[in-house]
Amino acid sequence: IPGLSEKYTGEELYLMTTEKAAKTADICLSKLQEYFDALIAAISELEVRVPASETILRGRNVLDQIKEMLKHLQEKIRQTFVTLQEADFAGKLNRLKQVVQKTFQKAGNMVRSLQSKNFEDIKVQMQQLYKDAMASDYAHKLRSLAENVKKYISQIKNFSQKTLQKLSENLQQLVLYIKALREEYFDPTTLGWSVKYYEVEDKVLGLLKNLMDTLVIWYNEYAKDLSDLVTRLTDQVRELVENYRQEYYDLITDVEGKGRQKVMELSSAAQEKIRYWSAVAKRKINEHNRQVKAKLQEIYGQLSDSQEKLINVAKMLIDLTVEKYSTFMKYIFELLRWFEQATADSIKPYIAVREGELRIDVPFDWEYINQMPQKSREALRNKVELTRALIQQGVEQGTRKWEEMQAFIDEQLATEQLSFQQIVENIQKRMKT
């Protein structure tokens, strides 16, 4: 093999190839599971109700189904490669070699015995030999092997179709789930990061769709090639048997001692067929291994790029959110500062603004939130004293002067900056004017 210093037999190369393919497939499936976990870990705890229905999409259930499916597929692939690695090719080749040797030995003995028999006896014996060969255990085993191979291929095909169909259904459900989350929780007015999210979402969904299409195409090609190979091998075996039959009839008419030459020709033809079948099988295995490795490397690279882009977009969204929050808090603080400056003259005695604190001193007795505020007891006491002073000075209740003086007293008490004596003096001045 180019690039390798040592020489390997066909069986060793087969074992090395299957072991490498098994490890690569195992690593690929493990990485796929890790990337899926990292991709949807943020939404695994969310629940989305489908509009106009009572259906609830739970991310946890979708994740569990995908994980179970990947584990089952991984176990099936591992068991398949273990079964292929445990195949006893050396024993089977030895048994085939023994069968061929016995066959040629019997053919040689038969050729030697033909010299003492006439044409009719030889013809009857050859017909009986052909019937015995077709009814022998080896012929039954060969037919049984072909039927079993076709049966196994059909089972593998049905299982793969069901698995791919289930994976496609789960993928479509995941796509609907992600779109429902986006429509419910993402604000479409925030154009900057929503566009980035749409791009990442389209790339991830496109990657998953390409993965499914690649698996379906690869499966169809592999199943078709394997089925064609089995059919071709079966036809070649049948053709070989028919050729042997014709050669046996040729040996019947051989009266010049050319039987040994015919036997050698048949042996060479059988060995050539065996070498051809081995070369075809090795070439198919190497070709499919290269295709699988190339596809897995391509998928791994795309997943790595998508993960990096997703992480960068997530970081950018987090930074943008923090920045927007800081801007909003600064706006609130500036609004309070402006409010303080605009109302400094009128409400400054009641409001105090500090960093992170807003204090309002209400000049009323307000014990409960569900009650209207009442004036303080001191303000009520001052109001009673001032009203009594008005009565003593001869101001009659219900008159216009009484109403004007009551309004003036309320204005004086509302300022909360004048003492009781100052208010009395102001009332006396007002009475004189």
Swiss-Prot record:
Domain of life from the UniProt record: Eukaryota
InterPro entries in the record: ApoB100_C, Apolipoprotein_B
Pfam families: ApoB100_C
Compartments reported by the entry: Cytoplasm; Secreted; Lipid droplet
GO biological process, one term: lipid transport
Signals that turn on the gene: Within 24 hours after estradiol administration, APOB mRNA is increased five- to seven-fold in liver but is unchanged in intestine and kidney.
Main location as per UniProt: cytoplasm
Glycan attachment sites: N158
GO cellular component terms listed in the entry, alphabetical order: chylomicron; cytoplasm; lipid droplet; low-density lipoprotein particle; very-low-density lipoprotein particle
UniProt keywords, alphabetically: Cholesterol metabolism, Chylomicron, Cytoplasm, Glycoprotein, Heparin-binding, LDL, Lipid droplet, Lipid metabolism, Lipid transport, Secreted, Steroid metabolism, Sterol metabolism, Transport, VLDL
Annotated GO MF terms: heparin binding
Function of the protein: Apolipoprotein B is a major protein constituent of chylomicrons, VLDL and LDL. It functions as a recognition signal for the cellular binding and internalization of LDL particles by the apoB/E receptor.
Name this protein carries in UniProt: Apolipoprotein B
Source organism per UniProt: Gallus gallus
Source organism phylogeny: Eukaryota, Metazoa, Chordata, Craniata, Vertebrata
Gene: APOB
